[in-house]
């Protein structure tokens, strides 16, 4: 079977997995989404200080929030943690210090290898997505 590209995982986050909070997400899916998510916000950041740029930035943020949360929940499932840890990450976005902590936690979640075997959240996505 053909391996999915990083961009395919990004597109599937908005189509197939927009509000999918069940199952698991492999590291490749996590980083594929993160790469294109960061590129979009880097481009929007250049226009964020203009009148329409602020509105566009907020609209894109609101549209991308559900797939971002669902991916984080499924990634937590892959490392055998409850998706409820996502709430702690969202709460930490409020103060500036919390943002730094949330970024570090996001990187750790994206780097830690998932459970090799099936766990209570589903089959290993590395094996089942090939």
Predicted regions and their residues:
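Membrane-interface extramembranous regions at the lipid-water interface
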Residues: 1-36, 67-85, 108-130
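Hydrophobic alpha-helical transmembrane segments in multi-pass membrane proteins
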Residues: 28-72, 79-111
